[in-house]
């Protein structure tokens, strides 16, 4: 859509003008008026619609219905809806009258050439180029919204390339085009018009840094046909007059929304009049389309799994075999990162977060590489980035990161409704410190990136009481057949003490924790009686419980949860340098693969031949239709302050809900 253009007519000679189909042109009849004029008439050739707007308060009327009083408040509006076959093949005639004269005092003639120019794309998110009445200069959220969507072309479709597809100015393989959005320029009108008129495709300097445009200048089955015409350091392009009604362009995103970039990009096509050699060219018409760059989206543990990742290190063979068996039961692929690549860094959950980005025509999984940069640093880029698998990362400028910047400290809830607002893609959960305190927080560049995606608003929880400091140390989500469709699992020292007190009451106080642990180092067993008589341990767990309770209230408020949506999982913590670590393997730090749960084996007290902690967890989760598998991670993970979830990662199905249908 373009602003109205004003054309002035003259009594001395006919005037010529170019108009664009469907776009209103204002005709100024007041610049040259015969003396004595008090009335006028306006007529046009067939195909020219002329209206008179008497005032701002009154609706416009057709001009050819009567003679009009000459009043400078009147506005003459001309519209043509079909392109011309020849130059100046239509015209408008204005006759100036005096009430004292029978014949007109004078005539003014405006010759018109109509050209149809539109810049189109998928405006209504229905995977087609739409030419309807929506305002292409706007991007509207919601189920009734509209606007074009642009993917960040962050995968690597060409196997011989070392870089992401959007890192160069060429199309290396035709499959790369599937990650781009189509933009079509349509023009109809006399060819001779373009002897002294030019079409310029252009964007702003800021937007040129965020996207790249390729013009199809040859056979579409040849990569050489795709010429880079807009992008960094290139803000405008004169579209050559190639034979044909349509010119096709492919647009790729270069960066996700972030601080200083809300994700909105505009492209314009402008028709310039270059007919006067003595003056600079003048704009006649501009059409604009707006894209929103598709956000990076996280997937909660309640979505179906597609692929499980785990690292093979020197002492976790049994663990990997257990994860492999669980993946087989869940029907998903298993990818093992060998020790030669991980260099004994087993914390694959901390290294990356697997999400996706989506447009109507394409869904692309994207790995978000954390700034922790351990020995696994190269794995996401070297092994996951590839054909139809994108990559993104954020690094603080001063390279200052803390343990909170590992992605065990990055989770997302299932869809929720809280305080009357729907969050159909859930809410991102990150850990930080208490308001006003000076503890650890997630680095600003990661926070800015997550916040800018808009579709999964952040909730910050308190984790600085934990030695490692990750949200997955005290919470998890599992699917459920009722209620909200999920349950929030929270680690609970209180629930653990109640369980142990019950077992002590029934005469099992001498039952031991940590029996049967196999590893390089001997683990000292401890009885229920000893746990319940250890006042230091009890006091520290009261502190841990208070921290979890703080988070419980935040989660209830920000996710709209009730107590019936929360399950307390028995867990104890111990103090290490005044911070908390799991006393026995952290039960909520589990691998969720649909209905199959891979839970750290707690090595709890054996009562009547069964671990009472395992039995308690089964009694809480199996009524939800979940299958509990307890995996021994004690030596390779728990002794290093991590568990099953920390040592695995999962790529999941995208949400069925389309992000552009939500209202942030």
Swiss-Prot record:
Class in the EC hierarchy, top level: hydrolase
Annotated compartments: Cytoplasm
Single GO term (MF): identical protein binding
EC number(s) reported in the record: 3.5.3.15
Keyword field: Calcium, Cytoplasm, Hydrolase
CDD domains noted in UniProt: PAD_N
Annotated protein name in UniProt: Protein-arginine deiminase type-3
Gene expressing this chain: Padi3
Its biological purpose: Catalyzes the deimination of arginine residues of proteins.
Tissue distribution of the protein: Epidermis and hair follicles.
Cofactor(s) annotated in UniProt: Ca(2+)
Reaction it catalyzes: L-arginyl-[protein] + H2O = L-citrullyl-[protein] + NH4(+)
An annotated GO BP: arginine deiminase pathway
Keyword presence, Transferase: no
Family affiliation: Belongs to the protein arginine deiminase family.
GO cellular component, one term: cytoplasm
Pfam families: PAD, PAD_M, PAD_N
């Amino acid at each position: 859509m373009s602003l109205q253009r004003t054309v002035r007519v003259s009594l001395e000679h006919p005037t010529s003008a170019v108009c664009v189909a469907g776009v209103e042109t204002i005709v100024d009849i007041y610049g040259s008026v015969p003396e004595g004029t008090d009335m006028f008439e306006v007529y046009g050739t067939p195909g020219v619609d002329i209206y008179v707007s008497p005032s701002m308060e009154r609706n416009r009327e057709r001009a050819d219905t009567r003679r009009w009083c000459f009043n400078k408040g009147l506005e003459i509006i001309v519209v043509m809806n079909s392109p011309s076959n020849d130059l100046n093949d239509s015209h408008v005639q204005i006759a100036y009258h005096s009430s004292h004269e029978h014949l007109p005092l004078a005539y003014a003639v405006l010759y018109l050439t109509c050209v149809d120019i539109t810049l189109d794309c998928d405006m209504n998110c229905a995977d087609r180029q739409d030419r309807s009445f929506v305002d292409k200069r706007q991007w509207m959220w919601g189920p009734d919204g509209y606007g074009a969507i642009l993917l960040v072309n962050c995968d690597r479709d060409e196997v011989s390339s070392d870089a992401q597809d959007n890192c160069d100015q060429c199309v290396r393989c035709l499959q790369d085009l599937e990650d781009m959005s189509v933009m079509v320029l349509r023009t109809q009108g006399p060819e001779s018009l373009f002897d002294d008129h030019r079409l310029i495709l252009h964007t702003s300097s800021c937007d040129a840094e965020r996207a790249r445009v390729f013009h199809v200048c040859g056979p579409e089955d040849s990569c050489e046909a795709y010429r880079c015409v807009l992008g960094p350091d290139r803000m405008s392009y004169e579209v050559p007059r190639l034979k044909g009604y349509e010119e096709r362009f492919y647009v790729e995103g270069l960066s996700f929304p972030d601080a200083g970039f809300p994700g909105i990009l505009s492209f314009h096509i402008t028709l310039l009049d270059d007919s006067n050699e003595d003056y600079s060219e003048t704009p006649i018409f501009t059409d604009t389309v707006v894209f929103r760059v598709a956000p990076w989206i996280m997937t909660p543990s309640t979505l179906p799994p597609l692929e499980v990742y785990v690292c093979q290190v020197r002492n976790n063979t049994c663990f990997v075999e257990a994860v492999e068996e669980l993946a087989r039961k869940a029907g998903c692929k298993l990818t093992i990162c060998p020790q030669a690549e991980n260099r004994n860094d087993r914390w694959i959950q901390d290294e990356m977060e697997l999400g996706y980005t989506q447009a109507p025509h394409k869904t692309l999984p994207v790995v978000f590489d954390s700034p922790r940069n351990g020995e696994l640093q190269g794995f996401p880029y070297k092994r996951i980035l590839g054909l139809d698998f994108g990559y993104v990362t954020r690094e603080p400028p001063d390279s200052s990161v803390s343990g909170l910047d590992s992605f065990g400290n990055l989770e997302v809830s299932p869809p929720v409704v809280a305080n009357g607002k729907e969050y159909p893609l859930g809410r991102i959960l990150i850990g930080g410190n208490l308001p006003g305190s000076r503890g650890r927080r997630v680095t600003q560049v990661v926070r800015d990136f997550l916040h800018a995606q808009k579709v999964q608003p952040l909730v910050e929880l308190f984790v600085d009481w934990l030695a490692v400091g990750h949200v997955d140390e005290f919470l998890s989500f599992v699917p459920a057949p009722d209620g909200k469709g999920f349950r929030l699992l929270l680690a609970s020292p209180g629930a653990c003490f109640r369980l142990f007190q019950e077992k002590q009451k029934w005469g099992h106080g001498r039952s031991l924790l940590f029996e049967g642990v196999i590893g390089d180092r001997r683990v000292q067993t401890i009885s229920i009686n000893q746990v319940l008589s250890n006042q230091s341990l009890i006091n520290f767990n009261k502190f841990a419980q208070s921290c979890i309770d703080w988070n419980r209230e935040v989660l209830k408020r920000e996710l709209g949860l009730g107590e019936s949506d929360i399950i307390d999982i028995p867990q104890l913590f111990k103090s290490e340098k005044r911070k908390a670590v799991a006393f026995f393997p952290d039960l909520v730090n589990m691998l969720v693969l649909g209905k199959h749960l891979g839970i750290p084996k707690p090595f709890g007290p054996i009562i009547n031949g069964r671990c009472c902690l395992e039995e308690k967890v089964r009694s809480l989760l199996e009524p939800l239709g979940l299958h509990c598998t307890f995996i021994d991670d004690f030596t390779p993970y728990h002794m290093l302050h991590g568990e099953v979830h920390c040592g695995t990662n999962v790529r999941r199905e995208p949400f069925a809900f389309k992000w552009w249908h939500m209202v942030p």
